């Protein structure tokens, strides 16, 4: 007589493995950080202390993100986080909401020659992605404030 629980156990195990695979793919392909809201604030100029930056290391040099984050912190920026990324980048890349976003422009002024890309994010954060090729490097004497022609900016809460 055949044992009835063997096929049932096999079906339960297959369902569990399928669910675990689906969940793993969903977690691996999801956003790095859940989008938090930003608050539109009226202002005529934006200073480094009002800008939150995430720094990612896409290169092979260990500690590159921390080094750049410390330079940004020294310039007055608020460092949201540092991390590594496996995404493929060439040179230093600044990622933010839009090209006319004052936060992005201020951060980009510290990295001459960096590539600036937009992803229409709604959280007010700016990402700096560094690789082994820092290009022209970090411009420590860049201006620490920028005029805001629109009169408002979306700052992270």
Predicted regions and their residues:
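Short, glycine/charged-enriched secondary-structure capping and boundary segments
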Residues: 68-70, 109, 142-144
